[in-house]
From Swiss-Prot:
Family according to the record: Belongs to the ribonuclease III family.
InterPro entries, sorted: dsRBD_dom (IPR014720), RNase_III (IPR011907), RNase_III_dom (IPR000999), RNase_III_sf (IPR036389)
Compartment(s) of residence: Cytoplasm
Name this polypeptide is given: Ribonuclease 3
Length: 232
């Protein structure tokens, strides 16, 4: 565990007072089961605690970061951030995969690279950090490790581009956004609409769809993908 302690100190300025607690956070059930006579604790209870504090802190962040997003969108984004694959990625970023104690069978079967095990260890670490320090230290760690990727948009599943474009453009105040139909083609029962989105009278994106609403979404998507620099 000394190497892990060095990583935590050098990269995150974290020093555990309770070294046994830290070791437990990285002990998988398979390792504990293979050493039953030693009565070694595994990390499942810490995982339970870490999951709870992670949900709380990510929820708080999203609530404050996106004041106009509805509950459903916030829940979807949170689910993307705290899902197994995402947490496993964060664990690898922190080099946690190197320090998990696994049983021999689990090790041979590739457990060290398994997202489930890595994600669980990441949550267990958060639980241990909460017990050894406090929620403020957990928040500091999350903001250092997780939030930069969230703010880079790695977990966004954008379905409402009109709302997303509006949020991007109105960060610093109200901006006049308007959608207008450029053309309509095809028979009445099968029309195709071409729409452009304008900001302060300037066209910043165009889209096409079989309804005005779909075409507007495509126009907004086109504007978002161009980047904000082209919108102002």
């Amino acid at each position: 565990m000394k190497e892990l302690q060095t990583v935590l100190k050098n990269h995150f300025e974290i020093e555990f007072a309770d070294k046994k607690l830290l070791e437990t956070a990285f002990t998988h059930t398979s390792y504990a089961n293979e050493h039953r006579l030693l009565k070694i604790s595994h990390n499942e209870r810490l995982e339970f605690l870490g999951d709870a504090v992670l949900q709380l802190l990510i929820s708080e962040y999203l609530y404050k970061k996106y004041p106009k997003k509805p509950e459903g969108d916030l829940s979807k984004l949170r689910a993307m951030i705290v899902r197994e694959e995402s947490l496993a990625g964060f664990a690898r970023d922190c080099q946690f995969d190197q320090f998990i104690k696994l049983g021999k069978g689990e090790e041979k079967s590739g457990g060290r690279n398994r997202d489930t095990i890595l994600g669980d260890a990441f949550e267990a670490f958060l639980g241990a950090l909460l017990l050894d320090k406090d929620v403020a230290k957990v928040k500091e760690f999350i903001y250092q490790v997780m939030i930069p990727k969230v703010e880079a948009g790695e977990f966004e599943m954008i379905t409402d581009y009109k709302t997303h474009l509006q949020e991007l453009l109105q960060v610093n105040g109200d901006v006049a956004i308007r959608y207008q139909v450029i053309s309509e083609t095809g028979p009445a029962h099968d029309k195709v609409f071409d729409v452009e989105v304008l900001v302060e009278g300037k066209s910043i994106g165009q889209g096409q769809g079989r309804s005005k609403k779909l075409a507007e979404q495509e126009a907004a998507k086109n504007a978002v993908e161009k980047g904000l620099d082209s919108c102002i």
